[in-house]
Design a protein with these regions (language model features):
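Mid-to-C-terminal alpha-helical segments outside catalytic/metal-binding sites
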Residues: 1, 85-125
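Active-site-proximal loop/turn and secondary-structure-junction residues that shape catalytic pockets
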Residues: 11-13, 35, 55-57, 76-78
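Histidine/acidic-residue-rich catalytic or RNA/ligand-binding cores of hydrolases
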Residues: 16-18, 41, 62, 80-86
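Short, structured coil segments at secondary-structure junctions
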Residues: 47, 65-66
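His/Asp/Glu-enriched short active-site or ligand-binding loop at hydrolase and phosphoryl-transfer sites
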Residues: 48-60
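Short acidic/histidine-rich active-site segments
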Residues: 68-80
Length: 125
């Protein structure tokens, strides 16, 4: 169906990257609640994954994620999404409006991929 696969990954990024390559995944993979370091973030991004950040995050990792690959979440937090987004924006050194634009760009990328894959599957039928 091409829907994004939302993953929780703790200390298994190498295995996750290997699995994505092995199965030749075409749908987007989003690692939610990402708390890893910048090096792990770069590896996951290089493997084509998206990263979602919540209340707890590694500031250096957050700074290496480009627009179009970044999401913000509340998952396990009692904080409101706008509070988390404000902290993320401050950490990235950007205004909240720019962060909002970056996240919207990510959503557009995810939806575009989902619709493109769904369209390809319909044409095969």
């Amino acid at each position: 169906l091409g829907k994004p696969l939302i993953l929780h990954c703790v200390k298994a990024s190498n295995e996750l990257i290997a699995l994505r390559k092995e199965i030749r995944a075409t749908q987007p993979w989003v690692v939610h609640g990402f708390r890893g370091n910048a090096n792990v973030a770069r590896q996951l991004l290089a493997a084509g994954m998206f990263l979602s950040f919540g209340e707890h995050f590694n500031a250096d990792a957050l700074k290496v994620v480009p627009p179009g690959r970044l999401l913000v979440e509340t998952d396990e937090s009692a904080m409101k999404i706008d509070e988390i987004a404000k902290r993320v924006a401050e950490t990235r050194g950007v205004p909240c409006e720019e962060l909002e634009s970056d996240v919207l760009q990510t959503i557009q990328v995810l939806l575009h991929r989902m619709l493109r894959i769904t369209d390809m599957n319909l044409k095969k039928s």
